[in-house]
Curated annotation (Swiss-Prot):
Described function: Involved in base excision repair of DNA damaged by oxidation or by mutagenic agents. Acts as a DNA glycosylase that recognizes and removes damaged bases. Has a preference for oxidized purines, such as 7,8-dihydro-8-oxoguanine (8-oxoG). Has AP (apurinic/apyrimidinic) lyase activity and introduces nicks in the DNA strand. Cleaves the DNA backbone by beta-delta elimination to generate a single-strand break at the site of the removed base with both 3'- and 5'-phosphates.
Protein name, UniProt field: Formamidopyrimidine-DNA glycosylase
Catalytic activity from the UniProt record: Hydrolysis of DNA containing ring-opened 7-methylguanine residues, releasing 2,6-diamino-4-hydroxy-5-(N-methyl)formamidopyrimidine; 2'-deoxyribonucleotide-(2'-deoxyribose 5'-phosphate)-2'-deoxyribonucleotide-DNA = a 3'-end 2'-deoxyribonucleotide-(2,3-dehydro-2,3-deoxyribose 5'-phosphate)-DNA + a 5'-end 5'-phospho-2'-deoxyribonucleoside-DNA + H(+)
UniProt xrefs under CDD domains: EcFpg-like_N
Keyword annotations: DNA damage, DNA repair, DNA-binding, Glycosidase, Hydrolase, Lyase, Metal-binding, Multifunctional enzyme, Zinc, Zinc-finger
Family the UniProt entry places it in: Belongs to the FPG family.
Xref: InterPro entries: DNA_glyclase/AP_lyase_DNA-bd, Formamido-pyr_DNA_Glyclase, FPG_cat, MutM-like_N-ter, Ribosomal_uS13-like_H2TH, Znf_DNA_glyclase/AP_lyase, Znf_FPG/IleRS
Source organism: Ralstonia pickettii (strain 12J)
Length: 291
């Protein structure tokens, strides 16, 4: 499943290709994703211009606004946001030349630039666990969308630090890994990067969240940011289906300290990496380096 780094890599890859372009048309071939695609989406998008491409957690947010100076548009035309979640196998690709759609290519958005050159933003999702949703309105209203309003703080937000984590885990008996995956303390730290961050901080993933000290949370906050930044710089992790918007695979997984390295020697101390199961998810850790 694409995690925060993979979504951010996708955002950065799409940014120069779609911002400032006008949507010529949209084609929805399959409406049955995790949540149904609005049948009116092609009509809602036609003529709007992409002005911003943001990320909130694992959601891509594409701002689409009307060109008010354009003649012939209805006076009540409103802009809004596309909310896109890649699910487990979703990808977004920019096509600069026509490519016939495949079986799993569900949504195409054709965009025109100032020079008239068209590109196509194509959403592909073999397992259909992703989402392409429309939210009419401004950014303030978007923040209250049911899928976004309860998300935790962004890991690169200046407010996110050890004090933030310490204050929000007092009295919690749940294991720290499970607490991080819940997404209400900090958003976007999925299974891969959770194992990696806990290793970098030297914290055993089964430790109760409420028993971790303030200094150790400071180390964990730093480890989370460093791990995610490294993953973004390396193009994310390619475990099964993920590729960036240019079709290239990420390679963070090749340099992982613990993830998917069960039985192999720890890169720091040589102890065999241990694999356990927490909440039906595989966890990897070093029994010597993490305590």
């Amino acid at each position: 499943m694409p995690e925060l780094p993979e979504v951010e890599v996708t955002r950065l890859g799409l940014l120069p290709h779609i911002t400032g372009r006008r949507i010529v048309r949209a084609v929805v071939r399959h409406h049955g994703l995790r949540w149904p695609v609005d049948p009116a989406l092609p009509e809602l998008l036609a003529g709007l211009t992409v002005t911003r491409l943001l990320r909130r957690g694992k959601y891509l947010l594409i701002e689409c606004v009307p060109e008010v100076e354009q003649s012939g548009r209805a006076a009540d035309t409103v802009g809004g946001w596309l909310l896109i979640h890649l699910g487990m196998t979703g990808t977004l690709r920019v096509l600069e030349t026509p490519v016939p759609p495949g079986l799993h290519d569900h949504v195409d958005i054709e965009l025109a630039g100032a020079t008239g050159v068209h590109v196509t933003l194509r959403y592909r999702d073999p397992r259909r666990f992703g989402a392409v949703l429309w939210h009419a309105g401004d950014e303030a209203g978007l923040a209250e969308h049911p899928l976004l309003r309860n998300l935790g703080i962004e890991p690169f937000d200046a407010r996110f630090d050890g004090d933030w984590m310490f204050a929000r885990t007092r009295g919690r008996r749940v294991a720290i890994k499970s607490a991080l995956l819940a997404g209400d303390i900090v958003v976007g730290v999925g299974n891969i990067y959770c194992s990696e961050s806990l290793f970098r901080a030297g914290i055993r993933p089964t430790t109760a969240a409420g028993r971790i000290s303030r200094p150790r949370y400071a180390a964990l906050a730093d480890a989370i940011r460093a791990t995610l930044a490294d993953a973004i710089a390396r193009g994310g992790s390619t475990l099964r289906d993920f590729v960036g918007s240019d079709g290239q695979s990420g390679y963070f997984q090749l340099e992982a300290f613990v993830y998917d390295r069960a039985g192999l020697p720890c890169r720091a101390c040589g102890t065999p990496i241990r694999q356990i199961v927490q909440g039906q998810r595989s966890t990897f850790c070093c029994p010597t380096c993490q305590r």
